[in-house]
């Protein structure tokens, strides 16, 4: 039984530093990209990123640059030189639009006016909305006299929820 003892050098490659910042929330139907530079800013340079729907990184995310569903996804940062990788979660938030349902106010005879801010105009809408009143569907020209509208026409009511998402709907006024 002859034997020889030789020293063996074992080296460990460090895991890459992967920093993940959740992208800002958006309002539906907008999508979110987790491939943008800001999501992995602060990570080691030169990493290759792949995107998954599960923490074990076995189910590839089909379109990581246009995610349309809220949830937790996973980013795998790999150092292609060493083969070492780290998997980190990223949370995507896509907020729903509020429902704004308009009930046109009853016609009035001049000199009477119509108050668009009364609850009966928006009673069937989502709760907790903040309303603004507009002359146009693009919400560029505000309707300053929305509590005393004296001219017939189509105006617009925009409802915004606590997440900042909004929906705008027309309201018909007959004076």
PLM segments and residue spans:
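Short, exposed coil/turn segments at beta-strand boundaries within extracellular/luminal domains
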Residues: 1-5, 81-87, 109, 162-168
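C-terminal edge beta-strand
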Residues: 5-11, 86-94, 167-175
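Solvent-exposed strand-loop boundary residues in beta-sheet-rich modules
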Residues: 14, 55-57, 81, 137-139, ...
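Proline-enriched interdomain boundary motifs that mark the N-terminal boundary
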Residues: 15-22, 97-104
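A short beta-strand segment in extracellular, disulfide-stabilized domains
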Residues: 30-41, 112-124
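Solvent-exposed loop segments of extracellular immunoglobulin-like
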Residues: 41-55, 123-135
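Solvent-exposed segments in extracellular or luminal domains encompassing
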Residues: 60-73, 143-155
